[in-house]
Amino acid sequence: METNWRLLDTGHRPGPENMAIDEAIAMAHGRGEVPPTLRFYGWNPPAVSIGYFQSMLGEVDLDAVRAGGYGYVRRPTGGRLIFHHMELTYSVVIREELLPGGVIETYREISRGLLAGMAELGVPAALSGGDRDPRRADPDGFHTACFDTASAYELQVGGRKVAGSAQTRRDGVILQHGSILLDIDVPLLFRLMRLPEGIPAERLMARFRAKSTTLAEALGRPVSWAEARDAFAAGFARALGLTLTPGQLTEREEKEAQTLVEAKYGCDNWNMRK
């Protein structure tokens, strides 16, 4: 595996911009213009994202989202609804030839960096087992959100999911991104979702709490975004033997990201397509 990577901290940005930047990095890396990239980012305003195969209108209460001043966007990856609020988000972009293996194998390798980041914080995390493909569309409606079910090789603390990831591949480039929960407001999350009929919200929230956790809960103290960023950067470097060189988006990446916001991620013909 290539071990010289670029490290990006792009701060907190709107949802469409975050997804556009991930895609722009993948395009630039595919052209050989930038090295493999580990990016950390946040969301401002907080936003709901849905997986590529989901229905925005079927999953999200857009009236509640807009009333709260939140954003919304469809991801280029699969998986289920996430409310990006009190979290650290990461993305990894690397060509398939530089990180050989199928989806599960590369997912496991990237998860080694995440697991080491947890160790940097003192969180006793472990990787989930099983063979559930991270690209799978959401299962039945009883699974309400990303963090109530773990895919293979996702991070758990005491059997409860603390980070969720998804991967896609295009033109020989791997893009994997995921959310690491610093904390969570479960009632707020459920107010922004369309819930299955006939199942009380209280029951679904209880299930969610039983299956998910946060860094704050695991450590018994708040964890800042910057503290988590630094810990996971150190974890990736240590576990994968990387040399991480801090950098910035190139001018072309910035321009292509803006074009993608205007033509794709900021548009209803993408976000409402299903």
From Swiss-Prot:
The active site is at residue 146. One of its GO terms (molecular function) is lipoyl(octanoyl) transferase activity. The keyword Transferase applies. GO terms for biological process: lipoate biosynthetic process; protein modification process. It holds the Pfam family LplA-B_cat. Coiled coil: none annotated. The record marks 161 as: Lowers pKa of active site Cys. Keywords: Acyltransferase, Transferase. PROSITE patterns: BPL_LPL_CATALYTIC (PS51733). Residues 32-244 form the BPL/LPL catalytic domain. In the reaction, the free carboxyl group of octanoic acid is attached via an amide linkage to the epsilon-amino group of a specific lysine residue of lipoyl domains of lipoate-dependent enzymes. The reaction proceeds via an octanoyl-thioester enzyme intermediate. Monomer. Belongs to the octanoyltransferase LipM family. Catalyzes the transfer of endogenously produced octanoic acid from octanoyl-acyl-carrier-protein onto the lipoyl domain of GcvH, an intermediate carrier during protein lipoylation. This is Octanoyltransferase LipM. It comes from Symbiobacterium thermophilum (strain DSM 24528 / JCM 14929 / IAM 14863 / T).
